[in-house]
Amino acid sequence: MLLILPEITLTLIALLGQCFALMIPNKNKIIYNIVILLCIISIFLTFKYSSYEGIWHSFATGINIGISKSIVLLFTIVSLIIYRDYSNLIGEAIKFEFITLILLSIVGIFVAISSRNFLLLFCGMELTALTSYALAGFKLDDIQSSEGALKYFILGSLVTCLSLFGISFIYGFGGSIQFEDILHQLNNNSEIKPGLIIGIVLFLSSIFFKLASSPLHFWIPDVYEGSPISSITYFTSAAKIGMVIVLFNISKLIIGNYYPINYNLIKIIAILSMLFGAFGAIQQTSLKRLMAYSTILNIGYVLIGVILPNQEGYKAALLYILIYAVVSIGFFTCLIMLFGKDVDKASFKTIQGIAETHKTIAALISIVMFSMIGIPPLTGFFGKYYLFYQAINKQEFTLAYCGIFTSVVAAFYYLKVVKAMYFSKKNSIIKLPIQYGLLLINYLVLVFLLFGSFIILF
């Protein structure tokens, strides 16, 4: 029971909160704030200082797993605060279904992070996927949201079939669904069955799809464009971090030193993601679609760290995805504070000249863009430097050069945002009331981007 206490706690918070919200509909805001407070307290339940594998060696706990879960939950809480303040800003009633879906999605991520066999991993990933489809289509009166969610659901269902097909291959040719058994066969067996390799590749396709890495990235621009901004902050932070940790587990606990998958396959996907993400964003005018391609690009960078055969590679990748999650949240909260209910229409045209009327927000967006480019001494520079340094240190020159090249290409459209704000003709934007939750998040992002490098170094 104690083994799955965080998962049970979050499930109860989600379900009981939903029941109270239905019974006392005029108190949704109070219930919502109580649930956020309970989620903050739940962070402490994720820490387990002793490593243990229970439920027939299928579910693991430990200090590293606890830290991973607490990071994911922390970013989830930020997304919930953004949704609350966004609803207040546009004068819309809080829909408690949003918090229920997100918390159940997090339970799925927690299960996936702790799982040590394929069936449990599949169940966790599918719980996350099903709730994500609903979050993508949460704007019921918006045809773009429904279209994006439908595309996401159809493609996600196809990838689910592939992952199940992969599990059947793994069990059929490997004789087990336990991670340790498959790891032993891949790393200690001179005659590896091709069916086992096919099964692992098919299962990996579902991870790459959820990460939006190329060539399984085509869903993400439409989903980002149609999804509510609060859902996007969750997709681009907590959900992505969770899936990166799951990929780490698969790379370390299943594939191990079997280089045809753990090196060649992931290397190709990393290069494709960097190239598609960098060049795909150049022609975009919508800022939400721009960030979708930016996600593809940055997932490509994260995969560089996954490929590297040492612990430093994993640290570099995890650090980079954390920095990117913070940067993305900062950017989207700035857009909410600028445009309110018109945030979905945010584009290069609508941000023209905002530096004249919204100096603070324009400055923060500029810092976010400079951090994404990797300009020192911002934290984004440190993340890229550490990642590329580790790649060069392990003789991965192709990946490092591709990363540097695509960073230069991406600088074009990141600087284009700054140019539109400071050097273009002014557009009139109505000043919106201050939401202190969003303001606090923005200031924390600013502190992290300016001083995060020094905190990490020391």
UniProtKB/Swiss-Prot annotation:
GO molecular function: NADH dehydrogenase (ubiquinone) activity; NADH:ubiquinone reductase (non-electrogenic) activity; quinone binding
Top EC class of this enzyme: translocase
Presence of keyword Lipid biosynthesis: no
Ranges annotated as spanning the membrane: 2-22, 30-50, 62-82, 93-113, 118-138, 153-173, 196-216, 235-255, 261-281, 290-310, 319-339, 361-381, 397-417, 438-458
Protein name per its UniProtKB record: NADH-quinone oxidoreductase subunit N
Keyword set includes Cell division: no
Main location: membrane
Alphabetic keyword roster: Cell inner membrane, Cell membrane, Membrane, NAD, Quinone, Translocase, Transmembrane, Transmembrane helix, Transport, Ubiquinone
Catalytic activity: a quinone + NADH + 5 H(+)(in) = a quinol + NAD(+) + 4 H(+)(out)
Similarity comment: Belongs to the complex I subunit 2 family.
Subunit note: NDH-1 is composed of 14 different subunits. Subunits NuoA, H, J, K, L, M, N constitute the membrane sector of the complex.
A biological-process GO annotation: ATP synthesis coupled electron transport
Intracellular or extracellular location(s): Cell inner membrane
Chain's role: NDH-1 shuttles electrons from NADH, via FMN and iron-sulfur (Fe-S) centers, to quinones in the respiratory chain. The immediate electron acceptor for the enzyme in this species is believed to be ubiquinone. Couples the redox reaction to proton translocation (for every two electrons transferred, four hydrogen ions are translocated across the cytoplasmic membrane), and thus conserves the redox energy in a proton gradient.
Entries under PANTHER family matching the protein: NADH DEHYDROGENASE (PTHR22773)
GO CC annotation: plasma membrane
E.C. number: 7.1.1.-
Membrane-protein topology: Multi-pass membrane protein
